[in-house]
Amino acid sequence: MSTYSRPVLLLLCGLLLLTLAIAVLNTLVPLWLAHENLPTWQVGMVSSSYFTGNLLGTLLTGKLIKRFGFNRSYYLASLIFAAGCVGLGLMVGFWSWMTWRFIAGVGCAMIWVVVESALMCSGTSRNRGRLLAAYMMVYYVGTVLGQLMISKLPTDLMSVLPWVTGMVLAAILPLLFTRIVNQGSEHHEATQVWPMLRLRHARLGVNGCIISGIVLGSLYGLMPLYLNHQGVSDSGIGFWMAVMVSAGIVGQWPIGKLADRYGRLLVLRVQVFVVILGCLAMLGNAAMAPALFILGAAGFTLYPVAMAWACEKVENHQLVAMNQALLLSYTIGSLLGPTFTAMLMQNYSDNLLFIMIASVAFIYLLMLLRKAGEHPTPVAHA
């Protein structure tokens, strides 16, 4: 059976449209609020409500998939996200937008859980690395294209909302032409999320997703601030961020293929070591282009490899719950990482960004080295 079957390709097409909409709104919502002269703390609260919605959506989706299946869960998640988009146009204000962004956050997290779980259930331990690499490539390409659309199209609220909402609704169409089946789970009770977090033999994957959240959350949220403090112009910041994200896109396919061929443990060790090297290069004032490229190529590919590691440790009927647990772990890391790193940067030095990332990467590397040889490679799930 081909790795990229018809259902997988249609699912990724829908994801691309959704990611475009998510990227556009995540960039423009803070700007729209700033144009309405809302104080910074309220803009931050609206952003936090979106991530709080992510947490709730992650926890709800497993039971939804068990009851309604992948297709109908995907439709519902897309409609919830579309409602969160439309609501922004009803009234501009702190409480109103905090509510609608919370709803959008729930819908986005549900979409991610459905798509990631469907990909996990569509593959085996021999090709999940490539499936997740394709997923992350689509996600990052959609993010970059979303930023390009912002630079080329009008960005006022009522100009953006109609086509963004239309894009979300259009993302439903591809899955109308296929049916994604959760094979092997029909005769099992829904697995709970919390026991997945405590599985000893999957702990490296869970920890890897937390570390990935810390690394990516810090790079996404604080790298622009670091570059700004170094005297880089706004256009220059956009360029260097594009270099880093593009490196993540380029790295997805080869790293996913290497993980499938040589094992995820070896690839994770190399990735984490390269992240540390990238941080040391930035701290040592090395040439920024190669330093950011290797940091992006290694850091932005941690999540799919760690996820594939954890998912190959559980049975097919546990994949949805495990995926929820991993996305929850990633979200927690992406919330906590930038918060603590920003405090350290403010009180001490901007270099703490790379010291923090290198430190958590080093801790994870020690875990990976300590676990060497403890867990045999499992039999591939059919």
Curated annotation (Swiss-Prot):
* Cellular localisation: Cell inner membrane
A GO molecular function assigned to this protein is:
transmembrane transporter activity
GO annotation, cellular component aspect: plasma membrane
Where mainly located? membrane
Assigned keywords, A-Z: Cell inner membrane, Cell membrane, Membrane, Transmembrane, Transmembrane helix, Transport
User: Could you say which protein family the record assigns here?
Assistant: Belongs to the major facilitator superfamily. YcaD (TC 2.A.1.26) family.
Q: What is this protein called?
A: Uncharacterized MFS-type transporter Ent638_1421
Q: Which organism is it from?
A: Enterobacter sp. (strain 638)
